[in-house]
Amino acid sequence: MTHSLYRKNIISISDLSQLELRHIMDTAAYFKNTPPVNLLKHTVIASCFFEASTRTRLSFEAAIHRLGASVVGFSDDQFTSVSKGESLSDTLRVISSYVDAIIIRHPKEGAPQYAAGFCPVPIINAGDGTNEHPTQTLLDLFSIQETQGRLSHLKIGLAGDLKYGRTVHSLTKALSTFPNNEFFLISPPELSMPCPLVKELNHSVHHTIEEVLPQLDILYMTRIQQERLKPEHRHLKTAFILEGKHLLPGQVKTNLKILHPLPRVDEIAPEVDTTPYAYYFQQAANGMFIREALLALLLNPHAPYP
């Protein structure tokens, strides 16, 4: 019988049930220990990045190659007919006739949802403006499960740009579906989490990392995104910096893990990298396994793995 993820559009993390989240993570864990070979041979996947990306684009493309599939696409829309005035719908309609799935990153919120309305192949949202980034959330959940052994009964700090940061928007939506999670929202007032996202959360609001750090199981740091800031808010760019002095023995829980969607600028000092709490590079590496799992499940109807 065909499983529920087969040919499914991945637009929002809310599109996935807890059972589907577990299926993707279990498959990623399996692939991490047992690399897949030619599972998607003769499959062609489009990587359409209308906005700059390093980790997301390259981890998707590495995942595609490791699955035995082929990838076509672009990393900048200036090299496409969009730069000549072609509409997004015309571009993607044509691309969808060549491929089995489309990965899209776009600066406009809602672009992947729009594409899903007319493309006959699965659409995967690789980030749409300040809205969502569901595949980043999948690797975040996988990293939390890997380090904490659970996705419930956690104390989670979200720090930095909570207003424009799409990664924290998706992660909050996902973790709020698991029981007894408590959220500590740490940001300047100008960059606080949008009200619709916090309305149903068990949360508290804070303006410094130090005041909540001793309580946390997970600290999810984010970059203050200057490219999305209004000029009057640009002074906030370096407002939240985590340093080694904040992580001395006895000051934090032994199971604390620090995550970051990357790229970082200066919000995490380099000396933090060598502490046992830093997990952001392992988190980034997990992106390839999660994206392998997602593509394999979307494009294989029988999913012959756990």
Swiss-Prot record:
Gene3D superfamilies: Aspartate/ornithine carbamoyltransferase (3.40.50.1370). It comes from the Bacteria. It is an enzyme of class 2 (transferase). HAMAP family: Asp_carb_tr (MF_00001). Heterododecamer (2C3:3R2) of six catalytic PyrB chains organized as two trimers (C3), and six regulatory PyrI chains organized as three dimers (R2). Belongs to the aspartate/ornithine carbamoyltransferase superfamily. ATCase family. This is Aspartate carbamoyltransferase catalytic subunit.
